[in-house]
Amino acid sequence: MTSRFGHSHHPRRGRSARARAGRREGVQSNFPATQVLERSAHSLPARERTALVMAGGTGGHIFPGLALAEALRERGWQVHWLGTPGSMEERLVPPRGFAFEPIDFSGVRGKGLKTLLALPLRLARACLQARAVVRRLQPDVVIGLGGYVTFPGGIAARLARKPLLLHEQNSVPGMANKLLSRLATRVYTAFPNVLPDAQWVGNPMRRAFTRQPRPERRLAGREGPLRLLVVGGSLGAKALNDIVPQALAWIHEQDRPIVTHQSGESQIEALRRSYAAAGVEATLTPFIEDTAAAFAEADLVLCRAGASTVTEIAAVGAAAVFVPFPHAVDDHQTTNAQYLVKVGGGWLVQQADLTAHGLAEMLQNMKRQDLLAKAQKARTMRKINATRDIVAACERLAR
């Protein structure tokens, strides 16, 4: 389980100043979130509004999309979700009550020449499928949050002259959002200076992350062993699962942190064996239902550096050691982590440098006052109104 600096606008060739100004207007407001949304709602016709959300592949795309979908539903919107069959989004979205619209499309990166040569035909077919969905639903807005499914869906939206809103979660833009950003009605980013002519709003997230007490209130008066939360994410992190039990075994039992370790569903049994072999007690779980509360409870979080993890850690205000996934596209997890690390809001350890002995020494040298300082610095970088701002823009565009 997770952004800030000022952003700048970069003019694009062929786009008029008036068009650029048109994009920038709208979501910025001097009114509180509820006031903005209430005003929008009162001025809208009584008809039901429809949004088509497009996001897939990983939890980093899907969970921000779910936060937006739930906020729109609370405002009376009908929300549909464009995704691919057999995917993570198909497992996560329908149980939350959103209609799932499947199309056949997947990525080509690293899948060989044959897959690359078949791309034009596959993309054309996916665009036709997405176009049929858009024609049937006639959505008031289409929202893309990344993953390959966003590209054919975004093309279909623009061909149908539907407003297209994009949100990029990472500090390095994904291919689909990068290509579509020139066609979009609005572009939003979780980190600053990611895409030209985009508005930096942070990541959509559940309210629980923004409502946790400040670090100085949560951590005041704590004594005893440190509380360590290890987060592998929705797919788990094998390197953390292997090294953390060994590191804890290096620490004398009376000095060990109290550990909660989230592994991912596929790795929970292997993790249990690793802790048993190390002779270390810990609370092991494949999934954490309330990540916000878990971040707030921990003195220290050891985790990957996906966009959602980094921005959620900033929202809560938690001290973290980030171990970026080394095979992430364009090494975007390192860039994500640096957003907090460079202001003193956490530590960055590359996976190649992570050893059991080194981690044990790091944990033994940590003091609560240092962790509090890191948590406070992380919280200064939080940007928590993405859901409000994007929903408000949807309501304006749907008038």
From Swiss-Prot:
Record SUPFAM superfamilies: UDP-Glycosyltransferase/glycogen phosphorylase (SSF53756)
InterPro entries registered for this protein in UniProt: GlcNAc_MurG (IPR006009), Glyco_trans_28_C (IPR007235), GlycoTrans_28_N (IPR004276)
Catalytic reactions of this protein: di-trans,octa-cis-undecaprenyl diphospho-N-acetyl-alpha-D-muramoyl-L-alanyl-D-glutamyl-meso-2,6-diaminopimeloyl-D-alanyl-D-alanine + UDP-N-acetyl-alpha-D-glucosamine = di-trans,octa-cis-undecaprenyl diphospho-[N-acetyl-alpha-D-glucosaminyl-(1->4)]-N-acetyl-alpha-D-muramoyl-L-alanyl-D-glutamyl-meso-2,6-diaminopimeloyl-D-alanyl-D-alanine + UDP + H(+)
Positions that bind UDP-N-acetyl-alpha-D-glucosamine: T58, G59, G60, N170, R206, S234, I288, Q333
A Pfam match: Glyco_transf_28
Pathway(s) the chain acts in: Cell wall biogenesis; peptidoglycan biosynthesis
Coiled-coil regions listed: none
GO biological-process terms attached to the record: carbohydrate metabolic process; cell division; cell wall organization; lipid glycosylation; peptidoglycan biosynthetic process; regulation of cell shape
GO cellular component: a single term: plasma membrane
Protein function: Cell wall formation. Catalyzes the transfer of a GlcNAc subunit on undecaprenyl-pyrophosphoryl-MurNAc-pentapeptide (lipid intermediate I) to form undecaprenyl-pyrophosphoryl-MurNAc-(pentapeptide)GlcNAc (lipid intermediate II).
Stated family: Belongs to the glycosyltransferase 28 family. MurG subfamily.
Protein name: UDP-N-acetylglucosamine--N-acetylmuramyl-(pentapeptide) pyrophosphoryl-undecaprenol N-acetylglucosamine transferase
Encoding gene (name): murG
